[in-house]
């Protein structure tokens, strides 16, 4: 079981992360949430994987991804995007992997497991 930090600009006080990303809520991972701002950096200290919600605000998602990258945090970043958002995604975002917003729990879980296994080794998926 991994500890996931869900970072989203749709997370207001009291809104649970599984409300924003329902497929993640069906998994057995520990879920925590943070707003898509600099406070997410502090919250990331207790996480194994950071899940960034880029479905509705790509510019802010890119800023958050780059903020994590520039801060030196080496945790895997999993970016959730719409199919239309793929056109904007490129290497300078600093994400470890992406997933489309319509993906089900099995795909989320597989990607999380792969990110954790690559983070434990030399960066290659084992």
Enumerate the language-model features and the residues they cover.
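Short hydrophobic beta-strand segments
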Residues: 1-15
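Conserved phosphotransfer microenvironments
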Residues: 11-19, 28, 33-88
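As written
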Residues: 91-96
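C-terminal output helix
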Residues: 103-112, 116
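Short, Lys/Arg-enriched segments at the junction into DNA-binding effector domains
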Residues: 117-126
């Amino acid at each position: 079981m991994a500890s996931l930090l869900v970072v989203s600009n749709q997370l207001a006080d009291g809104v649970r992360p599984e409300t924003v990303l329902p497929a993640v809520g069906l998994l057995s991972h520990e879920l925590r949430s943070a707003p898509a701002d600099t406070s997410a950096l502090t919250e990331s200290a207790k996480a194994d994987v950071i899940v960034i919600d880029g479905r509705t605000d790509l510019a802010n998602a890119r800023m958050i991804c780059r903020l994590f990258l520039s801060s030196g945090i080496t945790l895997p970043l999993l970016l959730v995007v719409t199919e239309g958002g793929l056109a904007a995604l490129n290497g300078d975002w600093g994400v470890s992997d992406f997933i489309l917003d319509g993906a089900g729990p099995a795909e989320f879980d597989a990607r999380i497991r792969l990110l954790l296994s690559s983070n434990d080794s030399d960066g290659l998926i084992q």
